[in-house]
């Protein structure tokens, strides 16, 4: 490449076009235009001599545009957010480096990296135009006609910082936006709280269902392990123990009554002679105690065990498979049946209950 600093020549030329009043700085909103004008100057320069073979080959090897779309979007966003930020001539390259990761010289040199040097006509075009632009006499020419210069100067006051009224209006607009965002935040917080509450309820329900499932699974395993269709093998040991103790108590009372009848033959004969009222008075206490107990057994039994449907018609009732319960059931069935008087007179009745 040539020893001439092409990026510097290009920068000086475009800076004179953008900094029309020679303030030594440009605003951030002018930065996108600066990049665009740099690209346009390069295109115009290479097209000055279309018959030059070296210039044509140089043009075909250029890598335009200067910046990719992503970097231009970053510069546009910076210009819109801080339109009146002052970028001084000495700090322009650093600002470009902060936004795109490359300074001005690097950006310009990248588009020429495939070229075998700069054609002499290209360098001379940049130098001549730069000299013309730098002369005070040609300031109006660089901007176009004097009318254009006057129009741009007349528009200059509109580019000054915003008035207090506009600032106040923007402040109120920002306040409204802030209130709207606060309301949205509150709504989202309420939604989150409702979701958390629903989640807690669902977790509680799932926990209860899991406990029930575990209990049923364990009971099912116990039933199959300890007896198949025999419903006595159930987890509820406390209930079963209570039933056993009550059955033992009832068995004891029955033995006491049998001993009293066997001990006093006269009582046995009087029992046969007297009417049913005398017999009922003898066993009234036992009957009043046993009947609620039997009802309690049937209710508990129906709650804690159920027979399989398929075996219901083939298996005997549970109370018939238990000797003590079977004897009690048949005894009270005989006592309260219509033919109870006949059973009282029969020898079979005496034989069953051990009365001789």
Swiss-Prot record:
**What GO CC terms are in its UniProt record?**
cytoplasm; nuclear membrane; spindle pole body
Q: Name one Pfam family in it.
A: MPS2
Q: According to its record, how does it sit in the membrane? A: Single-pass membrane protein
Q: Which GO terms describe its biological process?
A: protein localization to spindle pole body; spindle pole body duplication
Instruction: Name the domain of life.
Output: Eukaryota
Family per record: Belongs to the MPS2 family.
Spell out the protein name for this chain: Monopolar spindle protein 2
What is the species listed in this Swiss-Prot or TrEMBL entry? Answer: Candida glabrata (strain ATCC 2001 / BCRC 20586 / JCM 3761 / NBRC 0622 / NRRL Y-65 / CBS 138)
Gene this chain is encoded by: MPS2
